[in-house]
């Protein structure tokens, strides 16, 4: 299922970029113009990430591109959409490990949190800047090549 999802979503990335290039989809919508209906559709698309091999960020960006949102704004919204889940999961982990947390050196924990947060900001900024001058086709090809590599590896019983 993972190999199929990687391949299929890769094809969708390529198809969407082809339709954009052919002017069948125009990327004019801005985040500030998002309607409640748009938000519901994006949320429904995000739920497809429950399927193994389907990227939550990727499926949200695909949905937003189909709806006509600009690439970089789709990426920003996709990453912002992940924040509540990441924060909730982090607090749940901290709660589950509260006994260890009491013994932990909070300085090291704080440094780790800060470095991870800073790295995430740098990565998101780089990705948004990348999308200002590039398409998502490279990610479509990446997913297709990875799916083919995994399929070959599975057939040869390497993995």
Placement of each model-derived feature along the sequence:
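Multi-pass membrane proteins that catalyze or facilitate reactions on polyprenyl-/lipid-phosphate substrates
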Residues: 1-159
């Amino acid at each position: 299922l993972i190999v199929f999802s990687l391949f299929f979503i890769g094809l969708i990335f390529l198809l969407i970029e082809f339709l954009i290039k052919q002017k069948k989809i125009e990327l004019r919508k801005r985040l500030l113009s998002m309607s409640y209906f748009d938000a519901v559709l994006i949320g429904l698309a995000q739920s497809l990430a429950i399927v193994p091999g389907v990227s939550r960020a990727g499926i949200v960006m695909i949905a937003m591109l189909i709806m006509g949102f600009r690439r970089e704004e789709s990426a920003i919204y996709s990453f912002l959409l992940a924040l509540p889940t990441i924060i909730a999961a982090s607090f749940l982990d901290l709660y589950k490990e509260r006994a260890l947390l009491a013994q932990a050196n909070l300085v090291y924990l704080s440094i780790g949190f800060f470095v991870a947060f800073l790295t995430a900001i740098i990565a998101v900024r780089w990705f948004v800047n990348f999308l200002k001058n590039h398409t998502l086709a490279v990610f479509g090809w990446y997913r297709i090549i990875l799916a083919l590599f995994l399929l070959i590896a599975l057939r040869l019983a390497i993995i």
